[in-house]
A protein has these predicted regions:
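Electropositive, glycine- and tryptophan-enriched low-complexity nucleic-acid-binding patches
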Residues: 1-43
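Eukaryote-biased feature marking scaffold/signaling PDZ-domain proteins and nuclear chromatin regulators
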Residues: 7-10, 43, 68, 80, ...
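Surface-exposed helix-capping loop/turn segments at secondary-structure junctions
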Residues: 37-46, 121-127
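RNase H-like two-metal-ion nuclease catalytic core shared by retroviral integrases
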Residues: 50-52, 58-60, 74-98, 104
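Short alpha-helical patches at protein termini and domain edges
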Residues: 59, 70, 109-112
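C-terminal anion-handling pockets and recognition modules
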Residues: 85-149
Length: 149
């Protein structure tokens, strides 16, 4: 799991097995809060976007967000074209395809993902976030249908 802001990439969290609401909240504690602190975002100024996966919308996760003064951005279900992290993962996949030798195990895949994640330039994150008004406009123009994003 990864998170990023306008000019930064947060800490990458390795997920083993299937994530549930409890593990999600642990990741928020261990990765989101430190990333927010390191980014210099003032307390209460963080607006967090996530999809509507049940673990994200669980009572446990909602309570955690409230307790940590993090505003959630309302999000339409089934809208990956509006989800900038999906496009960042696509960028990572393209970078992973550049390795000439296939990874020999899960540990090596994780190592490579972390290497690519840590090398992401802030401009990549900035461009994705700044593309949001165009993305929203395209969805409105398509009346909720498919877009080029």
């Amino acid at each position: 799991m990864g998170l990023y802001g306008l000019e930064w990439c947060g800490k990458l969290a390795e997920i083993e097995g299937r994530m549930d609401a409890e593990q999600y909240v642990e990741i928020l504690d261990d990765h989101l809060l430190p990333s927010i602190e390191e980014s210099g975002i003032a307390e209460g100024d963080c607006i967090f976007q996530q999809d509507n996966d049940p673990k994200h919308t669980s009572r446990k996760a909602r309570n955690w967000m409230e307790e940590n003064d993090i505003t959630l951005l309302d999000w339409a279900p089934q809208s990956p074209d509006l989800n900038p992290i999906e496009h960042l993962w696509h960028h990572i996949k393209l970078q992973l395809c550049k390795y000439e030798v296939p990874a020999t195990g899960v540990w090596q895949i994780w190592e490579r993902v972390a290497e690519v994640w840590n090398a992401i330039e802030p401009e990549v994150c900035q461009k994705l976030i700044e593309s949001m008004p165009r993305r929203v406009e395209a969805v409105i123009k398509a009346k909720g249908g498919n877009t080029k994003y």
